[in-house]
């Protein structure tokens, strides 16, 4: 992730360990964290699951170069046999990139070990106890509004499918929206004209929904279901894409939880885009996992996954996202073929139990 967090002052290994959960959004385990610094401030914080697959750290050198990283801190969480090879590889890649590793730590079961310091008086073989909960860094981070969830699973649950009455109500609203579209489409004498009207209305609904969110509103079930159908159309989804802002994260989170599964890939991908733009690559990755679990071939999700795997910065998009007018020029006027992704989803509709 690209860090945009308020500055925290770190002066010891214990401070680093206390800060990491706030940099990645949760308390990691079985993980490798690399924090890149420039001019003494954290610019990026990246995380990998352990054990590392071959080549997982290859994007580090290009990342260091793009972000102007001159120093790094490496932290591994877990037992030595799992952490040490990963830390060694990260340190080697940093050295090749002429990035100085200021500290390299392993943390496990409430103790840490330094790979940089070999002095027994400060870094004993049995490890040094630490407690992130009592650290001044944790207190400072909390005051500054930073949050560290207990683990990655807790973060995953923030966009898990809604259940119970919420799910049942959304299922009914979706069935009604699908029935309405089917009836209107079946009665349309000209499918090209229907496509034009549908896309025009869908573009307006996207902008209205985002404006409502900005003023504190929330889509009701019927509006959410309708927007889920709209976003199946690539041109309508791309309208939302061109408008992406990190402030949209709660909006797309809500829809990722509420929509029926087959309508999730567009909204989860838009959530990933907004999260990535805001520097939260962990949430972006989780959202993309949701999208690709449902539709492994969904192109927007695969494109963003490629960017995240290569540790690309969202800054590459500055000035490069097309405008709505440019999308219209590139894609041409709406026509019946634009409806095919939506029609495929309509065909998947199942009866709702009474």
Residue ranges of model-derived segments:
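Charged, compositionally biased boundary regions
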Residues: 2-22, 27-29, 43-354
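Short acidic-glycine loop/turn motifs at beta-strand connectors
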Residues: 37-41
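Short beta-strand scaffold segments in enzyme catalytic cores
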Residues: 32-36
